[in-house]
A protein has these predicted regions:
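Active-site segment of metal-dependent pyrophosphate-handling enzymes
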Residues: 11-13, 58-61, 65-107, 123, ...
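RNA substrate-recognition surfaces in RNA-acting enzymes
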Residues: 177-208
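N-terminal strand-loop-strand
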Residues: 2-43
Length: 225
């Protein structure tokens, strides 16, 4: 058995994490400048190699926890990227994962420690290797699922206004949404609950605050917007 494996060249496997946040009505991406060769100084996603005792998912969870200090994040595999020349250092196949976080939950000291920046997706710079393609594929994945899965709530605080929720959808879809129709549909969804609290910070008149009832959704996980 050992001889069989030794006859084949070694290929490295890594994970790269595409971390999206929502701030100032914009969908943002967490990136930093590479501190090693190849590509030193280039903008890049954050990732790491898969350990010998790790699954792909476990490796991505480890990287995300190191990066954000957060656990139990929404995370989804985007795909595998294995172009022969994607990494000039070694033959590396990377599996990309998309994560959604509430920016307010993110420990800013960790961002500073890793030298990371929140960059609006619409102004995303050229990234290292095929990382722009990873982000593009992750965004396409979110657009495919946002109307059939409650993804957007991962980007919002526990209590949010309908305006904030609409802006998340518009930021991900890249288009404006009719306010009247959006609110009419939202009010038909049982697990988006209106609370008795009022937002007086982002609304001059005071806007009602809503919350996502995950328990109610789990009991009847049908979502279509």
């Amino acid at each position: 058995m050992t001889g069989f494996y030794s006859e084949h060249s070694k290929v490295w496997v890594s994970v790269d994490c595409i971390v999206f946040g929502f701030e100032e009505d914009k969908l943002k991406l967490l990136i930093g400048k590479r501190q090693m060769d190849p590509g030193r100084g280039e903008w890049s996603l954050y990732g790491g190699f898969v350990g010998p005792q790790e699954s792909l998912t476990e490796a991505a969870q480890r990287v995300l926890q190191d990066l954000t200090g957060l656990q139990k994040l929404y995370m989804r595999q985007v795909g595998a990227f294995g172009a022969i020349d994607r990494d000039p250092g070694e033959r590396v196949i990377s599996v990309a994962y998309c994560a959604l976080i509430n920016v307010k939950d993110y420990d800013d000291s960790l961002r500073e420690r890793y030298g990371l920046e929140w960059v609006p997706v619409e102004n995303m710079p050229k990234l290292y290797s095929d990382h722009n393609t990873m982000v593009k594929d992750a965004l396409a994945m979110l657009r495919r699922h946002i109307n059939t899965e409650p993804l957007s709530f991962n980007l919002l605080p526990e209590l949010f206004t309908l305006t904030q929720l609409q802006h998340v959808y518009e930021a991900i879809l890249g288009t404006e949404i009719d306010k009247r129709n959006f609110r009419k549909r939202i009010k038909q969804i049982d697990f988006i609950e209106k609370t008795d609290k009022i937002d007086k910070l982002t609304s001059k008149r005071g806007a009602a605050l809503y919350r996502f009832n995950s328990k109610a959704y789990d009991e009847d996980p049908e979502f279509k917007l």
